[in-house]
């Protein structure tokens, strides 16, 4: 959520930033109008309360002097009713303002390129060279079924489209990837490992910006009023919701693996085969809490943490900065890492790393103190995929496939695969 002072002091800037996303900036005028009404109501209410205090003194004085106080008592009752009415009006305006503010996205950083869609994202780095095959490479969805690593048909029977059973060495590879990523982030990148709740309440979803605007993208357990998480970013960021982080704690760096659940509303017809776009998938997440002046350097570091995984696995990738028309709701700036997939003859997103500045912290009331005597300030929150496990799985299977149908295990993963260096079709 944005600071109301930005609307008061820099309305033109806020309007232009909203328009860069392709959104309607008239909400700024709506907020300013409501804010003016609110301030007038507060002023009027304070005047009434001051008069009520004065009348209370007059009543007491008249009673001490044994004078008739009926007139001032009547005024006191009228003032009480008027104050109650003003408070009700103020509460209504507050609810209207919050209802609008909570749907306004974060302000985009000045260095984010302008554009309308992912086609306008700007490549800033490329690593590795896509492999040239001496044979016709297969798509990962064909490879995993031939090697008995996955079963899409039985998953469809059990759960519907966009689900998968990972079987045999497919399940082992998925587990190995999660263990490898978590180990890398905790032992080399300084993150604290967390196991997170995968069902959360509405306040938690509100804190990170999924609610109320993106409810259609979520799965909800209606009876309990809980939501399945679309990413571990949600519970990790809300760890400090409604708390003041004590001096000396920041920077705080969490990592955790979880299943992620997404309805993929609006994705009909896209990536219908394989592991790229599922309703349920595994992901390793990185979340950071930073002092405001440190968050931009933290974004660069977090992105290189994700890149280190891809490089150690030997997977060609590129880094792009998302344009104004493609960046997420809560982010001020986002880097996407895109891995090379031979089946697409293109790069596909495998990680997003974002600086959300104080946007989520204001929604979730996450504050910190620089020292014991200091006034609490809003922290900056960052999140990044480190990485999307299923897409990493697909990238390994496609980029490390062999002509005989086997798949070579990247060297970095061998210890996590029990020493196994190759995946072959099971004998049975």
Swiss-Prot record:
Keywords, comma-separated and alphabetical: Aminoacyl-tRNA synthetase, ATP-binding, Cytoplasm, Ligase, Nucleotide-binding, Protein biosynthesis
Entry keyword annotation includes Nucleotide-binding: yes
GO terms for MF: ATP binding; catalytic activity, acting on a protein; serine-tRNA ligase activity; transferase activity
Binding annotation for ATP: 262-264, 349-352
Residue positions binding L-serine: 231-233, 285, 385
Enzyme Commission identifier(s): 6.1.1.11
Family assignment from sequence similarity: Belongs to the class-II aminoacyl-tRNA synthetase family. Type-1 seryl-tRNA synthetase subfamily.
Domain notes: Consists of two distinct domains, a catalytic core and a N-terminal extension that is involved in tRNA binding.
Record protein name field: Serine--tRNA ligase
Organism, scientific name: Staphylococcus aureus (strain MSSA476)
Gene: serS
């Amino acid at each position: 959520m944005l600071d109301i002072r930005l609307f008061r002091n820099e309305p033109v800037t806020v309007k232009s930033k909203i328009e860069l996303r392709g959104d309607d900036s008239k909400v700024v005028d709506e907020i300013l109008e409501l804010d003016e009404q609110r301030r007038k109501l507060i002023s009027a209410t304070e005047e009434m309360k001051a008069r009520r205090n004065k009348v209370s003194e007059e009543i007491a004085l008249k009673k001490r002097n044994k004078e008739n106080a009926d007139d001032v008592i009547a005024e006191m009752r009228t003032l009480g009713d008027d104050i109650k009415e003003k408070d009700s009006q103020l509460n209504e305006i507050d609810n209207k303002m919050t209802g609008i503010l909570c749907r306004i996205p974060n302000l985009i950083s000045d260095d984010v390129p302008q554009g309308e869609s992912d086609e306008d994202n700007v490549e800033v780095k490329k690593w590795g060279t896509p492999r040239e095959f001496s044979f016709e490479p297969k798509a990962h969805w064909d490879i995993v079924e031939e090697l008995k690593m996955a079963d899409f048909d039985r998953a469809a029977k059990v759960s519907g489209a966009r689900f998968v059973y990972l079987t045999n060495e497919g399940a082992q590879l998925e587990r190995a990837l999660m263990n490898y990523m978590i180990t890398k982030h905790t032992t080399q990148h300084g993150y604290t490992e967390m196991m997170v709740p995968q069902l959360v309440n509405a306040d938690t979803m509100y804190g990170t910006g999924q609610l109320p605007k993106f409810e259609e993208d979520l799965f909800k357990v209606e009876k309990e009023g809980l939501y399945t998480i679309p990413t571990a970013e949600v519970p990790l960021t809300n760890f400090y919701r409604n708390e003041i982080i004590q001096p000396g704690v920041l920077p705080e760096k969490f990592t955790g693996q979880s299943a992620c659940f997404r309805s993929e509303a609006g994705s009909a017809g896209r990536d219908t085969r394989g592991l790229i776009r599922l309703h349920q998938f595994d992901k390793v997440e990185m979340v950071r809490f930073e002092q405001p002046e440190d968050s931009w350097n933290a974004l660069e570091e977090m992105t290189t943490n994700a890149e280190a995984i891809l490089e150690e696995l030997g997977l060609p990738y590129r880094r792009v900065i998302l344009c104004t028309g493609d960046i997420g709701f809560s982010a001020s700036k986002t880097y996407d890492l895109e891995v090379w997939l031979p089946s697409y003859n293109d790069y596909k997103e495998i990680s997003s790393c974002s600086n959300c500045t104080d946007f989520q912290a204001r929604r979730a009331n996450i504050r910190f103190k620089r020292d014991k005597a200091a006034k609490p300030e809003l922290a900056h929150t960052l999140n990044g995929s480190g990485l999307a496990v299923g897409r990493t799985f697909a990238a390994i299977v496609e980029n490390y496939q062999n002509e005989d149908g086997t798949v070579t295990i990247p060297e970095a993963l061998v210890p996590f695969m029990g020493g196994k260096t190759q995946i072959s079709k099971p004998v049975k």
